[in-house]
Amino acid sequence: AGIPIGEWFTETEEQVLAARGEMKKMETRKKRTPVMDSNTYKGRINIGITRMKQLFPDKQIILLTPLHRAFANFGETNVQPDENYQNSCGEYVDAYVQAVKEAGNLWGLPVIDFNSVTGMNPMIEEQLIYFYDSGFDRLHPNTKGQERMARTLMYQLLALPV
């Protein structure tokens, strides 16, 4: 399964009052509005962050990027190729990682880049010590991998303001 990446904004042209070194007047300018489309990854992020900011206006929201991913075979109806392959809608995992980083910039949120700072990559055979089972599940971290993720998260969180 895959979800299209989508767009962050739609653009429209609108009239807006503006002045800079001249008399104020109405001008036509482009205006962007966040896309709230549950059928796209960026739309879902916009929806989720908007809702969290409404429900928890005084809380720090932190985004995490997805981990690297490798082959997983969970049966006849659930086989997931590694990250060298596009998903069913033609996207590589890198596009989803990049979208989370962009969301941090757009929404003013810190991003903890699990894709890089954990140092875990199941595409490298020697790193499979951090993943569940090299035979059929190179996607989910095992206990050792979860401990590494927890330490990464702890130290990254300590670097953020309260």
Please place each PLM-identified region on the residue numbering.
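Alpha-helical cap/lid subdomain in secreted, periplasmic
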Residues: 1-161
